[in-house]
């Protein structure tokens, strides 16, 4: 069967979000938005091994963060995704040990719940090579405790649904200053403005 022709500017998905206003709205993302953000993530995660990574699919895929940084990035690298219908800390650590998970995308609460899991010491989590965190700020104490527990530094990032979603991330290898949202993704322009939208110096 021949595949249909798809224009890069055509609508690919509608992501619903409350955004910064709290008023629900559907963000229209094109095929270009989705593919480019996935490729930016692939470039950023240059230490990913094509066809040899195992992702923990614990973040919901109906959310732009889960869809792009877990599902799409896994598909782009030919990786296996271990799906969890809903997040439960002990089920997550069991899955990491059983399937030798190497990549985990999560939100701060997930990492915190894993740290606080009463049975976490029973499981070997050292297969994890990369942890990505988004959706809300990562507390420094959670970052430090998770690193002590697994030996892996969480790479915190920033994005918004309207951007498709990721715009910034800390380097996968290198400095991870606590509280930093990282550096702009490739070909991403960033600026600081005040409430009157005047550009400010960095």
Feature map (PLM): residue ranges:
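Conserved AMP-binding
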Residues: 58-63, 136
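Conserved S/T- and glycine-rich ATP-binding loop of Class I adenylate-forming
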Residues: 11, 17-20, 55, 61, ...
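Gly/Ser/Thr-rich phosphate-binding loop
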Residues: 76, 93, 101-106, 115-176, ...
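Conserved adenylate-forming
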Residues: 2-9, 14-57, 77-79, 122
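Short Gly/Pro-enriched turn/cap motifs at secondary-structure boundaries
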Residues: 5-6, 172, 179-185
């Amino acid at each position: 069967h021949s595949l249909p022709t798809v224009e890069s500017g055509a609508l690919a998905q509608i992501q619903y979000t409350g955004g910064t206003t709290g008023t629900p709205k559907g963000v229209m993302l094109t095929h270009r938005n989705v593919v480019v953000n996935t490729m930016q993530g692939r470039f950023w995660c240059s230490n990913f091994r094509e066809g040899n990574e195992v992702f923990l699919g614990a973040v919901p895929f109906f959310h732009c963060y889960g869809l792009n940084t877990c599902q799409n990035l896994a598909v782009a690298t030919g990786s296996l995704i271990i799906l969890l219908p809903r997040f439960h800390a002990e089920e997550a650590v069991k899955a990491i040990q059983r399937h030798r998970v190497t990549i985990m995308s999560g939100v701060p609460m997930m990492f915190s719940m894993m740290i606080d899991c009463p049975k976490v010491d029973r499981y070997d989590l050292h297969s994890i090579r990369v942890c990505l965190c988004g959706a809300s700020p990562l507390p420094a104490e959670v970052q430090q405790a998770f690193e002590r527990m697994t030996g892996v530094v969480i790479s915190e990032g920033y994005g918004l649904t309207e951007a498709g979603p990721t715009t910034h991330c800390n380097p996968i290898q290198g400095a991870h200053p606590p509280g930093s949202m990282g550096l702009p993704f490739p070909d991403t322009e960033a600026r600081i403005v005040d409430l009157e939208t005047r550009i400010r110096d960095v």
